[in-house]
């Protein structure tokens, strides 16, 4: 069981309350080589690093006593005023259970959210939350708010994931921690 190793990592890093973030992904952890340049088979899923840093800054300002944990592989972007988490993905799942919430793209944190019983904000790029998302999360995309409109979706539009950082922060603040999580979207 990973609960003890997660607690040890949090204690070692002097972390109390925390929010988890994941703004890039698409690389398998299995067989990962840190010396490889970061590549992603679907880069339109990733949130722009410039905007991601703004989200981090806003979260730090709003939640001053809370650590921001960046859940990425070593060759993926890192953000100022966060701590990089180097734990195995199964430990990230365990860690998510006690997080204050998360902000992520369509990657492992959002997929762990139902079984970890945790809601968060998910920024969608070239994938559909109606296929891969969960209704307990705040699902956001540039062309639409938290309601899906298939007529506005084009998977090759590079603006899809360019959601304003302030909108992400506002939606994070609206997460209802008492609402049960779902198994899939509507």
Regions found by a protein language model. Name each.
Residues 32-126, 137:
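Donor-binding and catalytic core of enzymes assembling or modifying cell-surface/extracellular glycoconjugates
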Residues 131:
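Histidine-centered active-site microenvironments of extracellular/periplasmic hydrolases
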Residues 23, 86, 125, 142-145:
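Active-site donor-binding loop signature of nucleotide-sugar glycosyltransferases
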Residues 1-20, 25-29, 184:
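A nucleotide-sugar donor-handling region in carbohydrate enzymes
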Residues 19-21, 59, 68-69, 140, ...:
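Hydrophobic beta-strand residues in large extracellular and virion-surface proteins
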Residues 12-13, 62, 98, 178:
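Alpha-helix C-cap/termination motif
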Residues 1-9, 136-186:
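Leloir-type glycosyltransferase catalytic cores
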Residues 23-40, 151-153:
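Short glycine/proline-rich turn/loop motifs
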């Amino acid at each position: 069981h990973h609960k003890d190793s997660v607690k040890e990592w949090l204690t070692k890093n002097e972390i109390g309350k925390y929010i988890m973030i994941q703004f890039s992904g698409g690389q398998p952890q299995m067989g990962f080589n840190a010396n490889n340049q970061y590549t992603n088979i679907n880069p339109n899923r990733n949130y722009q690093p410039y905007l991601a840093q703004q989200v981090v800054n806003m979260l730090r300002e709003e939640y001053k006593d809370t650590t921001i944990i960046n859940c990425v592989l070593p060759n993926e972007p890192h953000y100022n005023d966060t701590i990089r988490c180097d734990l195995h993905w199964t430990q990230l799942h365990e860690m998510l259970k006690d997080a204050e919430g998360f902000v992520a793209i369509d990657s492992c944190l959002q997929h762990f959210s139902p079984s970890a019983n945790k809601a968060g904000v998910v920024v969608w790029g070239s994938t559909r939350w109606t296929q891969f998302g969960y209704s307990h999360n705040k699902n956001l995309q540039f062309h639409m708010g938290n309601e899906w409109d298939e007529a506005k979706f084009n998977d090759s539009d590079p603006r899809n994931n360019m959601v304003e950082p302030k909108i992400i922060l506002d939606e994070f603040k609206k997460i209802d921690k008492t609402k049960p999580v779902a198994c899939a979207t509507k």
